[in-house]
Amino acid sequence: MYRIAFDVNGNDNGVAAAVKASCQFLKENDNYEIILVGDEALINNELKLIENIPNSLKIINNPNVPSDVKNFHKSLRENTSMNDSIDLVAQGKADAVISSGDSGTYLACATFKLKRLQGVSRSAFMPLMPTIVGRKFLLLDVGANIECKSEYLVEWAKIANVYARTLLNIVNPRVSLINIGTEDYKGLEIVKEAAKELKDNKFINYIGYSEPRYLLDGVADVAVIDGYGGNLVLKSLEGAILSFKNLLKDKIMAKPIRKFGYLFLKGAFQDVAETLDYRNVGAAWLIGLNGLSIKCHGNSDSKAYLGALNQIKLVIKNNVLEAIKKELNDKPHE
């Protein structure tokens, strides 16, 4: 039986989405147990709306959230649902933790409690991203580290390489560094240094630099960048996708003839929307820790949470954490 600790207090819209997704996941996976950590009264109110509640759904009552997300030291000491959830993994009582709470607080608490893996200098946030060709790619770091060194980029590439084999089902993932151009002489020194080391790593399929504008074309399976640039790339891609959807909708609704034509193209438009829907992947992994940890959007709905839970299932099933430890020691995967 595998166990997932779920901090349900961090969602902007309450606990309903987390409860619904958890019940759906457990009905489809009878070898899992989910421990909902949050306001028990609110959780039970939502459970009243669900038929056939799985017996493998457990509750730990803790209605508290961090009182000051800018004060990480204070957050570490507080009795919160986030800390309780992470503690379950740290104590070996759960196999993974999931939360929608404040990103900085989650990063600090998870890093302090779970500890970094040997050979890892810094943790990083790593979401699965959609492309227009249907396949997905891993983007990291998207905000955990504003300042960066070349060794961080190399370490993250090694870790993401393992995740990509499992989450993307690719034997030899294409690993790339995001840069302002594809030429070797372009970019910051830390990027050039990381590129040289990745080229020399015989266990990584390093394909060179990738420009941000081509990421949605599926040019790489793993795209690595510092946290500052990665956060800008993430928000730019998410914003561009959303703006495109809204623009397309406005143009269709602007004229009656276009509305009529939409009736015949509705299926194609829905396919495009589904392909670019971030909720299908649901979350960002907090990588580099000695424990599985995943962070969801603060406004996640049940579809996004279910996507995150299914990612956790894949990673647990394929024993990714142990594979990462081997990768960090430059040992080939089996």
From Swiss-Prot:
<dbReference type="GO" id="GO:0006633">
    <property type="term" value="P:fatty acid biosynthetic process"/>
</dbReference>
<comment type="subunit">
    <text>Homodimer. Probably interacts with PlsY.</text>
</comment>
<keyword id="KW-0808">Transferase</keyword>
<keyword id="KW-0444">Lipid biosynthesis</keyword>
<dbReference type="GO" id="GO:0008654">
    <property type="term" value="P:phospholipid biosynthetic process"/>
</dbReference>
<keyword id="KW-0443">Lipid metabolism</keyword>
<comment type="similarity">
    <text>Belongs to the PlsX family.</text>
</comment>
<dbReference type="InterPro" id="IPR012281">
    <property type="entry name" value="Phospholipid_synth_PlsX-like"/>
</dbReference>
<dbReference type="GO" id="GO:0005737">
    <property type="term" value="C:cytoplasm"/>
</dbReference>
<dbReference type="InterPro" id="IPR003664">
    <property type="entry name" value="FA_synthesis"/>
</dbReference>
<keyword id="KW-0594">Phospholipid biosynthesis</keyword>
<protein>
    <recommendedName>
        <fullName>Phosphate acyltransferase</fullName>
        <ecNumber>2.3.1.274</ecNumber>
    </recommendedName>
</protein>
<keyword id="KW-1208">Phospholipid metabolism</keyword>
<dbReference type="Pfam" id="PF02504">
    <property type="entry name" value="FA_synthesis"/>
</dbReference>
<keyword id="KW-0963">Cytoplasm</keyword>
<dbReference type="GO" id="GO:0043811">
    <property type="term" value="F:phosphate:acyl-[acyl carrier protein] acyltransferase activity"/>
</dbReference>
<comment type="pathway">
    <text>Lipid metabolism; phospholipid metabolism.</text>
</comment>
<comment type="function">
    <text>Catalyzes the reversible formation of acyl-phosphate (acyl-PO(4)) from acyl-[acyl-carrier-protein] (acyl-ACP). This enzyme utilizes acyl-ACP as fatty acyl donor, but not acyl-CoA.</text>
</comment>
